[in-house]
């Protein structure tokens, strides 16, 4: 977990005293990324000054800068990064002039943000969660065993603080990077739609589906492991309740629980927000197609007519069958009044009237249970009623019986929090889950 032992004034005074500052224009940042990439290919993690100059030359060529002053500008860039604590320089009397350079933690952190952390991997996340699960289980076992203060520090607090918490922070960082990627995808989609939305529809669909899939993979992986992680954290919390001197472990467990809840909650919220954006884009595309199709065609036709003698063309057209939009929100249901007289056998009786009659009959029959204070087993009662009606009416009759039954009273077993058993109510696979009503 990210904790600060110093106060805000102390941190401000410390930064001012050490003259901390970072200034990385795009060319300097590119140079730092190039250094990190080349450094990752070396086993010893060290680079000479000549190798840094070669990396700077590649960046300079990419930015189309002059090559006449490459040596001076490379030296200035290297010195500036050493001053900003992005590179460490090591020199020796035996090899004067041949300094060795290594990336500092700050340099690694910046380059890691731009290079490695932007690559989402479900396998990487699964491995992280697997490591966390193992560490939490061992810590929970050690907490239940108990021991002296050294035991709690070494076997419980240390794994939680320096392994579990850091991996949680890494997962949280992955989520925040996914937030940035979502914003970048939104910007890309906006640019595509502003240029030529007809040609951009397929590209927009690809970007939307890829981002949705990545978010869903991330959330599914988190939810699959979330319950087990929370269970082990609760085991540790239960073990510390009888020890007043373990408040530091209890506070850390609470922080980890909050962090895990926040990670899983934001993952689901991020998916919901993206679904809303996905619908917004599709609605925009549909609206654009409805509003713009004739205007675009007319504009292109006028341009083609004006340039016909320079660029002759032939017009082909097809009259395709109309596509009907069958979405529920746009369907208009017809409910026209029927006039005329019909024979008595064909008289129409609305379902509401039948339902009211059935409800009255069932209510009267079920009232006997309340009068006699007899427990009402909803599964048996519904099954008995359904046996009197054809299969096509089973759903409606079952709903009426249940509505009337729950008005009579409640089941005391509902307050225990235990789920009721499923009971079959007909011979076609229908089941009901309800406790016996015994309090009227």
From Swiss-Prot:
Q: Which GO terms describe its cellular component?
A: cytoplasm; nucleoid
Q: Where in the cell is it found?
A: Cytoplasm, Nucleoid
Question: Mind telling me which InterPro entries this protein's record contains?
Answer: Chromosome_partition_MukF (IPR005582), MukF_C (IPR033441), MukF_C_sf (IPR038198), MukF_M (IPR033440), MukF_M_sp (IPR036141), MukF_WHTH (IPR033439), WH-like_DNA-bd_sf (IPR036388), WH_DNA-bd_sf (IPR036390)
- Which terms does the record give in the GO molecular function aspect? calcium ion binding
State the UniProt keywords alphabetically.
Answer: Calcium, Cell cycle, Cell division, Chromosome partition, Cytoplasm, DNA condensation
Q: Which CDD domains match?
A: MukF_C, MukF_N
Residue ranges, annotated region (Leucine-zipper):
208-236
Choose any GO biological process term that the UniProt entry carries and state it.
Answer: chromosome condensation
NCBIfam families reported in the protein's UniProt record:
PRK05260.1 (NF003615)
Q: Subunit structure of this entry?
A: Interacts, and probably forms a ternary complex, with MukE and MukB via its C-terminal region. The complex formation is stimulated by calcium or magnesium. It is required for an interaction between MukE and MukB.
What family does the entry list? Answer: Belongs to the MukF family.
> Its function?
Involved in chromosome condensation, segregation and cell cycle progression. May participate in facilitating chromosome segregation by condensation DNA from both sides of a centrally located replisome during cell division. Not required for mini-F plasmid partitioning. Probably acts via its interaction with MukB and MukE. Overexpression results in anucleate cells. It has a calcium binding activity.
Q: What is this protein called?
A: Chromosome partition protein MukF
* Species, as recorded: Escherichia coli O157:H7
């Amino acid at each position: 977990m990210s904790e600060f032992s110093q106060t805000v004034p102390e941190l401000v005074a410390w930064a001012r005293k050490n003259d901390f500052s970072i200034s990385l224009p795009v060319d300097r940042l590119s140079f730092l990324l190039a250094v990190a990439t080349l450094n990752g290919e070396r086993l010893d993690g060290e680079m000479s000054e000549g190798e840094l100059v070669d990396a700077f030359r590649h960046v300079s060529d990419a930015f189309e800068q002059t090559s006449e002053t490459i040596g001076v500008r490379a030296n200035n860039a290297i010195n500036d990064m050493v001053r900003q604590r992005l590179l460490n320089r090591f020199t020796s009397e035996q090899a004067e002039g041949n300094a060795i350079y290594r990336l500092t933690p700050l340099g690694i952190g910046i380059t890691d943000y731009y290079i490695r952390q932007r690559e989402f991997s479900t396998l990487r996340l699964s491995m992280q969660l697997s490591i966390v699960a193992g560490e939490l289980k061992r810590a929970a076992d050690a907490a239940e065993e108990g021991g002296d203060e050294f035991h709690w520090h070494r076997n419980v607090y240390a794994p939680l603080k320096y392994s579990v918490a850091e991996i949680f922070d890494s997962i949280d960082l992955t989520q925040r990077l996914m937030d940035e990627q979502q914003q970048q995808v939104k910007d890309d989609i906006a640019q595509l739609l502003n240029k030529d939305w007809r040609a951009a529809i397929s590209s927009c669909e690809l970007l939307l589906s890829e981002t949705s899939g990545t978010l869903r993979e991330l959330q599914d992986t988190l939810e699959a492991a979330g319950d087990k992680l929370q269970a082990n954290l609760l085991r540790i919390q239960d073990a510390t309740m009888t020890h007043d001197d373990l408040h530091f472990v209890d506070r850390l467990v609470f922080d980890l629980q909050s962090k895990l809840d926040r990670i899983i909650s934001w993952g689901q919220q991020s998916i919901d927000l993206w679904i809303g954006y996905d619908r917004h884009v599709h609605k925009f595309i549909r609206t654009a197609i409805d509003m713009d199709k004739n205007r675009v065609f007319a504009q292109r036709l006028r341009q083609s007519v004006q340039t016909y003698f320079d660029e002759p063309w032939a017009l082909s057209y097809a009259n395709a069958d109309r596509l009907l939009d069958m979405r529920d929100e746009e369907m208009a249901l017809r409910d026209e009044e029927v006039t005329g007289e019909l024979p008595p056998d064909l008289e129409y009786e609305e379902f509401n009237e039948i339902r009211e009659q059935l409800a009255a009959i069932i209510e009267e029959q079920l009232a006997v249970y309340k009068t006699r204070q007899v427990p009402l087993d909803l599964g048996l009662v519904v099954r008995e009623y359904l046996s009197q009606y054809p299969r096509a009416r089973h759903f409606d009759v079952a709903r009426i019986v249940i509505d009337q039954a729950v008005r009579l009273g409640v089941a005391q077993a509902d307050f225990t929090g235990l789920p009721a058993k499923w009971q079959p109510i007909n011979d076609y696979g229908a089941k009901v889950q309800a406790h016996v009503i015994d309090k009227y």
